[in-house]
């Protein structure tokens, strides 16, 4: 029996050995009603700020999301938590997404790139236009080859919603979040109604939070990458799931370079927790999946891939992206070549510091690794020469996942922040 009177399911402790996830968690995580109400008010404040300060499609999202968050915060004390969360997700994601899909226009330029890349992949074996056809910034494809999969339905002739990349981006994101969060429930969701409600609530909150909801509504390509990263972290709560975690992370790395930092951090964690063999297995699996997806495209036209995925994001091509941000690194890069070099130098120094700290004080659990990753990515996106505020969906999403999956009673073995990592003797 658990502390709240619930019987622990028989499969909580498999014959192969104890789980790393605490078996006797209560159904309700620590993130209870009081914290949830506060979170919705914070979400509402963010959405109101977007209405006042942003422009374009972001304002359309905020016009739907702000009242949804306010109503959720007011209704939560008298309503079922999971029902409020689901309705909030519908009005914060689905409603503005449908409005923007019906509106169309230039805001969907990223989807045009994905659709074109899928058609090129089928026709030429590469999703990238050759240098002679790169006539404007929109001709470039900064995504890695796996991102083209979201354009394949349109490339094979599907019309309407089934062929729209935006629909598939949302579906993959929600599926990835659901899979990651389902691994943290204490019992089987098929037999435990309490776990089903908790899981549904967590999925809805994760989808409705502004970091994810805004990016889903305006359809950026980051949420599915984040979802796969979270899935890899959740899978590694069990040492028996190294291969599935490696596959999930390898696919994420083949979509965008924003997932690359996850590999060394998780390798350091596995080396400390499970030994060198497990770390090598995970690293080899992730890299093998990444190479299996990207290497054929690289061999088909290496120059085109380098121009699109390396030179264009670094601002080293004739046509520059019109997107801008006010991050310190981007502001430095705009001052000229010296500022650009300084930004790159700061980024390299940050990377070296992270590498040294990983060797000296490796994270001891997936939760600690998630803190490492959130802090590392936040520093990279702050100091990088060509970063966007939208990239902060990664550190914010990681912190949100940590909040939603934190057990009601922390076990000392579940890890913590990077400061709680265990030092390794020199």
Residue ranges and their predicted role:
Residues 124-125, 239, 253:
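Hydrophobic alpha-helical elements and their junctions with loops/disorder across both membrane
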């Amino acid at each position: 029996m658990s502390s709240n009177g619930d019987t622990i399911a028989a499969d909580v402790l498999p014959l192969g050995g104890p789980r790393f996830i605490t078996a006797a968690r209560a159904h309700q995580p620590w993130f209870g009603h009081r914290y949830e109400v506060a979170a919705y008010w914070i979400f509402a404040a963010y959405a109101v700020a977007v209405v006042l300060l942003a422009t374009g499609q972001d304002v359309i999202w905020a016009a739907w999301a702000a009242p949804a968050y306010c109503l959720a915060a007011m209704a939560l004390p008298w309503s079922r938590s999971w029902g409020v969360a689901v309705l909030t997700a519908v009005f914060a994601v689905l409603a503005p997404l449908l409005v923007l899909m019906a509106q169309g226009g230039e805001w969907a330029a990223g989807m045009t790139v994905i659709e074109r890349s899928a058609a090129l992949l089928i026709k030429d074996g590469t999703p990238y236009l050759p240098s002679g056809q790169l006539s404007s910034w929109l001709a470039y494809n900064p995504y890695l080859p796996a991102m083209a999969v979201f354009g394949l339905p349109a490339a094979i002739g599907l019309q309407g919603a089934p062929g729209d990349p935006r629909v598939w981006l949302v579906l993959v994101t929600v599926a990835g979040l659901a899979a990651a969060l389902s691994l943290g429930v204490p019992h089987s969701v098929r037999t435990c109604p309490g776990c089903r409600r908790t899981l549904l609530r967590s999925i809805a909150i994760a989808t409705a939070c502004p970091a994810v909801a805004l990016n889903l509504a305006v359809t950026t390509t980051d949420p599915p990458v984040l979802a796969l990263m979270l899935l890899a972290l959740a899978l590694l709560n069990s040492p028996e799931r190294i291969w599935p975690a490696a596959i999930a992370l390898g696919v994420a790395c083949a979509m965008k370079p924003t997932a690359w930092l996850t590999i060394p951090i998780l390798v350091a964690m596995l080396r400390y927790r499970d030994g060198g063999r497990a770390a090598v297995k995970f690293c080899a699996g992730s890299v093998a999946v990444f190479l299996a997806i990207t290497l054929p495209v690289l061999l088909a036209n290496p120059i085109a891939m380098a121009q699109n995925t390396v030179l264009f994001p670094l601002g080293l091509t004739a046509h520059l992206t019109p997107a801008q941000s006010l991050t310190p690194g981007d502001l430095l890069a705009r001052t000229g070549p010296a500022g650009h070099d300084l930004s790159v130098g700061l980024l390299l120094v940050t990377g070296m510091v992270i590498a040294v700290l990983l060797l000296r004080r490796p994270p001891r659990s997936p939760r600690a690794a998630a803190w490492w990753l959130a802090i590392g990515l936040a520093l990279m996106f702050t100091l990088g020469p060509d970063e966007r505020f939208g990239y902060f969906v990664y550190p914010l999403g990681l912190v949100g996942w940590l909040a939603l999956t934190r057990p009601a009673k922390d076990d000392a073995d579940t890890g913590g922040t990077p400061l709680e990592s265990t030092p390794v003797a020199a």
